[in-house]
Amino acid sequence: MGEMSSFASDYAAALSEATQLAVIICDRDHCIAAAGAPKRDLLEKSVTPELEKIVENRKLYTSKGESLCAIEGCDRGIVVACPIISAGDITGCVLLIENEGVTTAIDSDIKLCEVAAKFLGSRIE
């Protein structure tokens, strides 16, 4: 996942700007990039068991009003989560999380999250 973290930060910043949501990019264990939220509160922090369950399903997750947290100690809920899959293996996740009152995603936000996960997955194959 080290090769992904080199450009994940730039991708997170662009995605956050486009969606107006905070963005977290994780490997299987930790946050490796963040934008739209204080990085010191997120980087290198462990993923929550709730996020692990979402990622293990290998499917796109969109919040239906639940307030699940992605990172230990982060109180912003997950809006969209899309697993990063490379060569058939789950390698991480791209997340859109709540940001300054924005708590829902529109269809284009969801598509952008899916594209980000596919792009990052292809970069580490």
Q: Where are the language model's segments positioned?
A:
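Juxtadomain coupling helices with adjacent low-complexity linkers
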Residues: M1-A18, V47-E52, C93, I97-E125
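Structured interaction and signal-relay segments at domain junctions
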Residues: S9-C74
